[in-house]
Amino acid sequence: VEEIERDGFGDKPAFWCVLAEDNGEVAGMSLYYIRYSTWKGRILYLEDIIVREKFRGRNIGTTLLIRTLKEAEKMGVNGTRWQVLDWNEPAIEFYKKYNCTFDGEWINCNMDKKQLKKALEAV
């Protein structure tokens, strides 16, 4: 919690979020930030849309996506980007409704802290 508070709610937030509430209870959220592409400039990256299980099926995910896309438009970015796991068929079907492009060309590369340290030690 401390890391989230520091990184998202300080003077220079690393991310922003949209919260969905139902009678004062958090029902879901989207978390996003700006990234920069050498080809496309400023892009809003949607890290997550999460809807708590008991609130699913009530268009909360739709509301969160639309609100996040409106934030992207307001920020004047050149587009949005996000990832979805290839096995997450419900999410894939959800995103298809919004005419997004599914890009099979890129392969994601990741390093956790341990891998990062090991890579730097090898130099």
Predicted feature residues:
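Conserved beta-strand in the GNAT
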Residues: 19, 25-33, 50
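Conserved acetyl-CoA-binding loop of GNAT-fold acetyltransferases
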Residues: 77, 96-105
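Active-site rim helix/loop that mediates acceptor-substrate recognition in acyltransferases
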Residues: 1-15
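Conserved GNAT acetyl-CoA-binding A-motif
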Residues: 72-84
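Short hydrophobic/aromatic beta-strand element in the GNAT-like acyltransferase core
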Residues: 15-19, 29, 43, 81
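Conserved acetyl-CoA binding element of GNAT-fold acetyltransferases
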Residues: 42-53
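Conserved acetyl-CoA-binding loop-helix of GNAT-fold acetyltransferases
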Residues: 51, 57-70, 93-97
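Conserved beta-strand-loop-alpha-helix junction that forms the acyl-donor binding cleft
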Residues: 82-91, 110-114
